[in-house]
A protein has these predicted regions:
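Terminal-region recognition feature
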Residues: 1-254
Length: 254
């Protein structure tokens, strides 16, 4: 029995549970929700959510994430594919970088009007000045160091300035960033192969995706819309924003 105070304190959770139940009844699919940065600790929570999923049913994932650890994203999509018939990733807002890797392993990507994927740009997570975790783009770390080296060569007197500007970056972080960047294409290919594509299909898709997802983008925030995604050959489609399913997804995300 729930006391009035307990009910009030946990009302948000009970409402989300009701929304998830209603969505599952309409679609006939299991639904899990991930609204978070992707880090290794996500795996334990995900396994808890997938624990009793029927592998003969479809699985829908509501995903909103700025990115994170690509290796964890690959582990997550592999685990989900083992627990379902077909995997649909629903993107109401953004699924960047590592979250895009996760989407590449799905059978379907359902995107809202403002939904977008992003470049596969590894994020380096390190302690900030306040002790909290902060993230920086691996590509931007390497680029910043490269530009600093060029400017110092041209003007050795600028060394103290750049040493101060890059005081939070050490050599280990730079090497980790370079290693993460070199792994990006392999992660993309592994994610594409998760849902059962043939080697030929993976090769063809990877060739189309390498330029827009890895090589070309200069910013982690670059937007890849549903039209771009379908143009690259991904199984993306626009959500029906007037449907009852989308109303439930929007309430869960908000």
């Amino acid at each position: 029995m729930r006391t009035p105070l307990f009910q009030a304190e946990h009302s948000g959770r009970y409402k989300r549970q009701a929304l998830i139940g209603e969505y599952q009844q309409i679609t006939g699919a299991n639904l899990i929700v991930v609204i978070d940065q992707i880090t290794p600790t996500n795996m334990t929570v995900l396994e808890e959510l997938l624990f009793d999923c029927d592998p003969q049913k479809d699985l829908h994932l509501l995903l909103s994430s700025p990115g994170g650890d690509g290796e964890t994203a690959l582990r997550m999509v592999r685990s989900m594919q083992l627990r379902c018939k077909e995997l649909t990733v629903v993107v109401p807002d953004m699924a960047k970088s590592a979250a895009t890797i996760l989407c590449l392993g799905a059978h379907h990507i359902l995107m809202g009007p403002g939904g977008d994927l992003g470049p596969i740009d590894p994020q380096m997570i390190f302690p900030g000045e306040d002790g909290r975790r902060t993230a920086a783009s691996a590509k931007e770390i390497v680029a910043a160091i490269g530009e600093a080296e060029e400017r110092i060569r041209a003007n050795p007197g600028s060394f103290p300035l750049f040493a101060s500007l890059l005081a939070d970056v050490n050599m280990l972080m730079v090497e980790q960033a370079k290693a993460a960047l070199s792994r990006s294409e392999a992660l993309m290919r592994e994610a594409l192969s998760v849902q059962g594509r043939t080697r030929e299909e993976v090769d063809a898709l990877a060739a189309k995706l390498k330029e827009p997802l890895i090589d070309a983008p200069s910013s982690h925030s670059a937007v890849i819309s549903v039209d771009h995604a379908t143009g690259y050959g991904l199984p993306a489609e626009s959500a029906d924003v007037n449907s009852e399913e989308w109303r439930l997804i929007w309430e869960l995300w908000m």
